[in-house]
């Protein structure tokens, strides 16, 4: 069996891709070269139709592996607000009706929570990461608890970062959009999920 040299990160979202790459690079996976969907021959990508983040992440990783033959890691993530029964959940990216409309999604969520008192504004960012290779399928979940702010703050990140105030030491009540990339990478839901996935990735990097 040939040495695995490429790991396909199954994403076209450049901001998410940059974050995933930073976390994986910081882990020192020297046996793997990261490539994205922008680096491979285009293929039909299945819609995100799963009932859970895990369903969607696994479907994306399976599709990418089947189309390219490269070991593939995929992420599906979103925001779960307790006052909305865990929504927007898997609908996070299209909560306002248009996929990827961060401003619209954020504005709608704030409007839906406008009368919710501070003590009931708990929420969590959730990331499911799936790894599919010729010998293995692994799915993990990372959760980053926090609360929903009453208005957007900060200009970094993407998605709901400007209204999510994460729990964590030394974060000082800032939203994710106000954190430095290194701070986000050290606490985020994707970091937590990828940390759980790291043993499988290290095996992949060493496999011959």
Curated annotation (Swiss-Prot):
Record carries keyword Lipoprotein: no
Biological process per Gene Ontology, one example term: nucleotide metabolic process
SUPFAM superfamilies: ITPase-like (SSF52972)
CDD domains for this protein: HAM1 (cd00515)
Active-site residues annotated for this sequence: 76 (proton acceptor)
Cofactor(s) required, per the database record: Mg(2+)
Binding positions for Mg(2+) per the UniProt entry: 76
EC code(s) of this entry: 3.6.1.66
Binding site for substrate: 11-16, 77, 158-161, 184, 189-190
Keywords per UniProt: Hydrolase, Magnesium, Metal-binding, Nucleotide metabolism, Nucleotide-binding
Reactions catalysed according to its record: XTP + H2O = XMP + diphosphate + H(+); dITP + H2O = dIMP + diphosphate + H(+); ITP + H2O = IMP + diphosphate + H(+)
InterPro entries: dITP/XTP_pyrophosphatase, ITPase-like_fam, RdgB/HAM1
Major enzyme class: hydrolase
Gene Ontology molecular function, alphabetical: dITP diphosphatase activity; ITP diphosphatase activity; metal ion binding; nucleotide binding; ribonucleoside triphosphate phosphatase activity; XTP diphosphatase activity
UniProt cofactor note: Binds 1 Mg(2+) ion per subunit.
UniProt GO cellular component terms: cytosol
PANTHER family registered for this protein in UniProt: INOSINE TRIPHOSPHATE PYROPHOSPHATASE, INOSINE TRIPHOSPHATE PYROPHOSPHATASE/HAM1 PROTEIN
Function statement: Pyrophosphatase that catalyzes the hydrolysis of nucleoside triphosphates to their monophosphate derivatives, with a high preference for the non-canonical purine nucleotides XTP (xanthosine triphosphate), dITP (deoxyinosine triphosphate) and ITP. Seems to function as a house-cleaning enzyme that removes non-canonical purine nucleotides from the nucleotide pool, thus preventing their incorporation into DNA/RNA and avoiding chromosomal lesions.
UniProt family annotation: Belongs to the HAM1 NTPase family.
Subunit field text: Homodimer.
Name the UniProt record assigns to this protein: dITP/XTP pyrophosphatase
Phylogenetic classification of the source organism: Bacteria, Bacillati, Actinomycetota, Actinomycetes, Mycobacteriales
